[in-house]
């Protein structure tokens, strides 16, 4: 049975049983819930989901000072959830969407901490829209199937699920993610399950991306190394790291050099890019500094450009994230790309202002994706820039160098302007003479 449905849960641990215990204020609810968590981790999913509920502490004094108080609190909370769920459909799409909504609401309320685990859905939609288009001929539309998609800083998994939503439930062979934070790692696994993704269809690894702790990614045989059709990521911005000397010879970095200790942005980028297939697409969110900073970052950026790997640079509005108000960019990379230019999209002015965060509306997202797909040129919005021009700019990718949003001032005709001033002065003289005539009739002082 497990082979067919992938997991088995005993009747006592089903939601309906737990909810009934809560309604009847059953004194064994807490014990049953803990036993259910242990069963799911150790037996229901075998070793695949070991530690899934490790961050849930049912003995926390926040629930109550003793067992009875904690049990009563759990009864109240679970009954309220059960009563609420009765009003909605219980299919996996609804449950998954509800879970995603709660993650989003938690992110909105947790401020800067949200950047550790959540990518706003509007931005996820842009990245997923890009990587699901045909890599060599985006204008031909979306791919029918992706063998694999990879997010090496997956947080709660929302970005990976956005790609899956775009491709459909059977459009991706394998969803692969990696997350360093244990709590967020568990959130991602739960998120997959609640969206109906089978345990055989995804793999989330808990470990450090930069040190490459995942054994399957450390395979030295190129023929056996994993490669992905699509790579998406929203890594921590300008993360401080301590690269060892040995990392300089790491297969991910040795052709480009190490990112500076003060900002691991390019280290994250090179990690994902290394595992991209030859015909794959990578879309990564980064701070604007990667476009123009000097030193080691300039050397990495220059080599990526000279090798023809940077396909598109997209500038987004400021204050889109819960964790930071700075504007960010999306870099689209390919190992084999047809155009010998770089597409720049300056979407910084296209947003709806909100009280706490700015928002991208569907039309803003569609405009970005349509411009990328058809490589359109538009005044003050997008431009295809040749490598010769980029070389002249010192391989600086600052978007405003190529696509300025400033409106061109209209040319002033000096002769015409002079004539207008003469006409105005003559009109003033005529009006004053007429006014003085009235004043004279009234016996009043005239205007000088």
Predicted features by range, described:
Residues 1-136, 200-203, 209, 315-318, ...:
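Non-catalytic, mostly N-terminal accessory regions of nucleic-acid modification and defense proteins
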Residues 34-37, 176, 198, 258, ...:
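Generic hydrophobic, helix-prone segments enriched in Leu/Val/Ile
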Residues 212, 216-218, 222-448:
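A conserved structural/catalytic subdomain of Rossmann-like adenosyl-cofactor enzymes
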Residues 89, 162, 186, 353, ...:
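Short helix/loop capping segments that flank catalytic or ligand/cofactor-binding pockets
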């Amino acid at each position: 049975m497990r082979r067919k449905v992938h997991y088995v849960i005993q009747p006592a641990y089903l939601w309906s049983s737990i909810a009934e215990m809560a309604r009847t204020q059953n004194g064994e609810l807490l014990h049953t819930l803990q036993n259910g968590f242990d069963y799911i981790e150790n037996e229901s999913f075998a070793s695949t989901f070991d530690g899934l509920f490790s961050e849930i502490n049912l003995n926390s004094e926040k629930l109550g000072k003793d067992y009875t108080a904690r049990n009563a609190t759990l009864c109240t909370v679970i009954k309220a959830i059960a009563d609420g769920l009765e009003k909605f459909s219980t299919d996996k799409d609804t449950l998954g969407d509800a879970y995603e909504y709660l993650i989003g609401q938690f992110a909105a309320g947790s401020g800067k901490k949200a950047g550790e685990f959540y990518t706003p859905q509007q931005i996820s939609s842009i990245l997923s829209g890009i990587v699901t288009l045909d890599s060599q001929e985006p204008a031909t539309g979306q791919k029918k199937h992706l063998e694999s998609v990879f997010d090496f800083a997956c947080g709660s998994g929302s970005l990976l699920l956005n790609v899956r939503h775009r491709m459909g439930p059977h459009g991706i062979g394998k969803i692969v993610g990696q997350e360093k934070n244990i709590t967020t790692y568990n959130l991602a696994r739960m998120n997959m399950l609640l969206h109906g993704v089978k345990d055989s269809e995804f793999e989330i690894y808990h470990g450090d991306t930069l040190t490459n702790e995942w054994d399957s990614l450390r395979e030295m045989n190129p023929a056996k190394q994993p490669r992905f059709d699509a790579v998406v990521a929203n890594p921590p911005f300008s993360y401080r790291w301590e690269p060892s000397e040995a990392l300089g010879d790491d297969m991910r970095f040795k052709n480009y050099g190490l990112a500076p200790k003060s900002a691991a942005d390019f280290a994250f980028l090179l990690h994902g890019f290394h595992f991209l297939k030859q015909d794959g697409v990578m879309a990564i969110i980064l701070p604007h500094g990667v476009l123009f900073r000097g030193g080691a970052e300039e050397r990495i950026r220059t080599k990526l450009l000279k090798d023809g790997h940077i396909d598109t640079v997209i500038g987004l509005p400021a204050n889109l994230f819960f964790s930071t108000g700075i504007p960010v960019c999306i870099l689209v990379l390919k190992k084999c790309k047809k155009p010998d230019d770089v597409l720049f999209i300056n979407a910084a002015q296209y947003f709806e202002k909100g009280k706490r965060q700015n928002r991208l509306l569907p039309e803003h997202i569609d405009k970005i994706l349509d411009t990328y797909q058809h490589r359109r040129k538009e005044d003050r919005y997008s431009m295809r820039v040749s490598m010769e021009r980029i070389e002249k700019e010192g391989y600086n990718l600052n978007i405003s160098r190529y696509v300025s949003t400033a409106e061109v001032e209209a040319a002033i005709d000096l002769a015409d302007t002079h004539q207008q001033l003469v006409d105005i002065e003559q009109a003033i003289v005529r009006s004053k003479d007429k006014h003085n005539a009235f004043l004279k009739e009234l016996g009043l002082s005239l205007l000088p």
